[in-house]
């Protein structure tokens, strides 16, 4: 028989899992009948439909962004709020993206009427990525801010003034938030902030980030809300990732506060499916309700003289928040470790436990943890080989994640069966119990050193286990129900703190989270191995066979359902790339799964396997030859160069003659450029793959961008590239072939034009008296003269130079050098019958014995 203890344990696991699932579902959306002082999801959705009903993407600086901005200003005016626009300044992110955001700023007075009163900021961003309309990220938050303003005005003013910031450029690198925090007069009075964002289109709203000294903040939050979903592991894990929101800027400014987001429907994030049809009113309502309560609590609190200190914290099924001060939790974890050793040692001395058996049980638990890690990674490899999961580096989200989540849960069940079977031969019940308690206490002590905010995970069940270990000290035999009850009590405490992590784990990390899920369950469920060990041979066999069957069914189900669907699509980018230096053009497809859909290969001669998108981008890309379109390439003009203390300095001007939406300058690794100066300020460049670095300008002005930099090496390659967020008309055939289960994402489908040239800053720039501008295909003829002097302006593209004269003399590569801004480089001109194909990028000079250059006429 299975055994009552094991059956009760399985029922307990199922009940706690269902309770966690229910807690992490957003509540029913509130309707228009909601009292005026409360947040109404229905009213917020009406505002959202009015703001982005046209469904157009609105990236920073776009015409659509200007239209949306005007609508937001109109809504604020209807609410009696007088917004101001913060404009005009160039801002760059920490990863080399620059733009000129336009922020919407307003102030709601508080009862503290002093001009320098401490204020609370309420923030959201109104820009979207170029690929999608951003209904949830972050249009829903903008609508929520407007609904919160309406609800605030239904009550008397708050104690502290509230500053509204609806900023632009978050998607481009938190540009609007940086501009506000650095330059707006109201920023100096802000002491706390509430930020709203989304990394999906649905799901429960989570408090995933707070200010630094957050013990008082969590206390404030716990008292303000009746339903709270948060824990300090979210906060700790988020700090270890490269992701950032506007709240990252606010934290860096020293402001306290709360950062809310929902992450359900993450497969639609930053795609065209982030639209009104997929925006969940329940998520909007829950996030708005939480933000309103948190904002009112902050606006009534003491923002300066609050108690210091951070806390570890977690919610209990969304009904309450348990707070543990970190200053006390660290010594408490070490004390627990000492108590676990002491109680276990006392039990050994009294003969209740056998030390070798406890050590053997500990080895079994450690081995199961290692095996869970190895087994999880192996299962990922197998599922990738079966094409159930995308390859490493691809999109980590699939359409039916429940299949693989079930498989990894079953894998952890097999580890439990293994623990119980081996432990039955090497130890008894209390010896395995003591080993579990020692493992939990040791893990808590280690986490207290390295990740203290996560140390509560093993500490809570560890405390329960050490207290229960006092029971066998009486020296009497305990009935079976006492032993089973002891194991299930600790199991309940372990699952209560662990399941809130397991539920959103996949949504946060995708496929890489699956082995972590298995390990987390193995670390949380060893207490279930105790009644399993006592279940009898038939019970253990039935449990092992059942979990193996679940694993098999999950894998078969994963094989039978599609990896991607129209509702949870693969992210696939299409690009038209024109290399003006080489005179080549390509259709490029970048599938996030790293696999090229067959329909494209059938239509065009795409490369057989993926290759890196560029020397600075490892994204897997497939290319096919495309027609060369008459697109003006971006221009680099070298204004000055000289020796500097760092190495070599230069001043440049970048221009996009075709007025592209983005303009970038990339430096080869030997340059070692790490900062550029634009508008008198120094900004960091992005450090890319292969040692390349870049600076990128969004919506650059028509006359271009002037910048300066310092490089270590005097000579290095640079690439100037501009980009638009659409494909040329000739790409229609590719767009029609796009599979239904794929969508563009992030920047969307793009057209890029690039030129590559070599700069040598050790030479003086060449004066430009003999310069002309040539368009692609222009024929330029010279008078008959060998070794004619020629100068070509940087704005020219690849062209053809026809010379009337001894072509072999003029184009003898052994005697001819081209120069770019005065720099001697390898020859770029190759003789081709009676003409030469020249890379007309930069300023070229062909030395001539003639005293006067021959005139050149088109």
Residue locations for each model-derived region?
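Juxtamembrane/start-of-transmembrane alpha-helix segments at the extracytoplasmic/lumenal side
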Residues: 316-336, 399-403
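Soluble extramembrane regions of membrane proteins in the secretory/endomembrane system
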Residues: 27-324, 666-669, 681, 686-712, ...
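Ser/Thr/Pro/Gly-rich low-complexity linker/stalk segments immediately outside membranes or between
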Residues: 23-39, 563-573
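Extracytosolic and intramembrane catalytic regions of membrane-associated proteins
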Residues: 70-78, 82-94, 99-107, 117, ...
């Amino acid at each position: 028989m299975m055994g009552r203890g094991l059956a009760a344990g399985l029922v307990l696991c199922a009940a706690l899992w269902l309770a966690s699932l229910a807690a992490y579902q957003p509540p029913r959306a509130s309707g228009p009948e909601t009292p005026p002082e409360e947040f109404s999801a229905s009213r917020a959705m009406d505002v959202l439909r009015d703001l982005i009903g046209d469904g157009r993407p609105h990236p920073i600086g776009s015409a659509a962004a200007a239209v949306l901005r005007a609508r937001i200003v109109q809504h604020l005016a209807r609410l009696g709020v007088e917004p101001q626009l913060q404009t005009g300044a160039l801002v760059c992110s920490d990863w080399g993206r620059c733009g000129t955001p336009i922020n919407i700023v307003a102030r709601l007075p508080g009862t503290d009427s002093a001009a320098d009163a401490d204020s609370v900021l309420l923030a959201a961003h109104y820009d979207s990525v170029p690929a999608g309309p951003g209904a949830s990220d972050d249009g829903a938050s903008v609508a929520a801010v407007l609904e919160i303003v309406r609800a605030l005005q239904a009550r008397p003013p708050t104690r502290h003034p509230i500053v509204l910031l609806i900023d632009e450029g978050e998607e481009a690198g938190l540009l609007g938030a940086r501009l506000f925090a650095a330059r707006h007069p109201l920023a100096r009075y802000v002491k706390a902030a509430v930020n709203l964002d989304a990394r999906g289109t649905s799901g429960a709203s989570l408090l995933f980030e707070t200010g630094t000294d957050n013990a008082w903040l969590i206390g404030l939050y716990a008292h303000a809300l009746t339903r709270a979903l948060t824990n300090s592991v979210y906060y700790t894990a988020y700090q270890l990732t490269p992701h950032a929101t506007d709240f990252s800027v606010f934290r860096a400014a020293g402001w306290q506060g709360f950062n809310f987001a929902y992450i359900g429907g993450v497969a639609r994030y930053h795609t065209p499916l982030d639209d009104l049809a997929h925006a969940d009113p329940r998520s909007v309502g829950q996030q708005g309700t939480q933000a309103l309560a948190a904002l009112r609590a902050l606006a009534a609190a003491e923002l300066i003289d609050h108690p210091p200190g951070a806390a570890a914290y977690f919610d209990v099924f969304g009904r309450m928040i348990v707070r543990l001060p970190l200053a006390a939790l660290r010594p408490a974890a070490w004390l627990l470790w000492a108590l676990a050793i002491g109680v276990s040692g006392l039990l050994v001395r009294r003969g209740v436990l056998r030390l070798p058996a406890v050590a053997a049980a500990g080895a079994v638990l450690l081995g199961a943890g290692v095996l869970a890690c190895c087994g999880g990674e192996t299962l990922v490899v197998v599922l990738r080989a079966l094409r159930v999961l995308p390859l490493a580096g691809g999109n980590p989200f699939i359409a039916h994640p429940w299949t693989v989540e079930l498989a990894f849960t079953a894998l952890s069940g097999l580890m439990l069966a293994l623990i119980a079977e081996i432990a039955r031969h090497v130890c008894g019940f209390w010896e395995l119990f003591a080993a579990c308690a020692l493992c939990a206490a040791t893990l808590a002590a280690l986490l207290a050193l390295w990740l203290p905010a996560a140390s509560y995970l093993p500490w809570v069940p560890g405390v329960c286990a050490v207290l229960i270990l006092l029971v066998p000290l009486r020296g009497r035999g305990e009935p079976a129900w006492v032993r089973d009850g002891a194991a299930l009590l600790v199991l309940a405490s372990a699952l209560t703190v662990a399941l809130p992590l397991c539920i959103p784990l996949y949504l946060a990390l995708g496929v890489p989270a699956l082995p972590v899920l298995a390990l987390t369950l193995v670390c949380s469920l060893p207490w279930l191995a105790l009644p399993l060990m006592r279940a009898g041979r038939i019970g253990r066999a039935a449990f092992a066979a059942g979990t193996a069957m679940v694993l098999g069914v999950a894998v078969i189900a994963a094989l039978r359902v599609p990896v991607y669907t129209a509702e949870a699509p693969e992210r696939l980018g299409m690009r038209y790339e024109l290399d003006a230096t080489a005179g080549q053009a390509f259709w490029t497809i970048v599938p996030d799964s790293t696999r090229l859909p067959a329909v494209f290969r059938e239509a065009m001669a795409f490369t057989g396997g993926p290759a890196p998108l560029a020397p600075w981008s490892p994204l897997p890309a497939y290319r096919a030859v495309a027609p060369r379109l008459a697109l003006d390439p971006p221009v680099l003009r070298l204004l000055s160069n000289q020796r500097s203390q760092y190495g070599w300095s230069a001043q440049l001007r970048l221009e996009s003659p075709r007025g592209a939406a983005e303009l970038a300058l990339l430096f080869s690794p030997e340059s070692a450029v790490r900062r550029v100066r634009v508008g008198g300020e120094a900004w960091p460049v992005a450090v890319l793959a292969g040692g390349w670095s870049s600076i990128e300008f969004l919506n650059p002005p028509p006359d271009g961008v002037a910048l300066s930099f310092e490089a270590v090496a005097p000579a290095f390659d640079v690439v100037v590239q501009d980009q638009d967020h659409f494909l040329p008309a000739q790409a229609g055939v590719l767009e029609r072939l796009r599979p239904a289960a794929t969508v563009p994402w992030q920047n969307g489908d793009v057209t890029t034009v690039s030129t590559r040239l070599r700069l040598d800053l050790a030479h003086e720039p060449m004066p430009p008296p003999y310069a002309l501008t040539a368009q692609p295909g222009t024929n330029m003829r010279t008078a008959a003269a060998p070794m004619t002097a020629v100068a070509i302006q940087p704005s020219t593209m690849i062209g053809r130079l026809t010379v009337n004269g001894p072509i072999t003399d003029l184009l003898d590569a052994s005697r001819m050098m081209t120069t770019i801004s005065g720099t001697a480089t390898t020859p770029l001109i190759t003789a081709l019958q009676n003409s030469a194909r020249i890379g007309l990028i930069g300023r070229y000079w062909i030395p001539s014995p003639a005293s006067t250059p021959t005139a050149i006429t088109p």
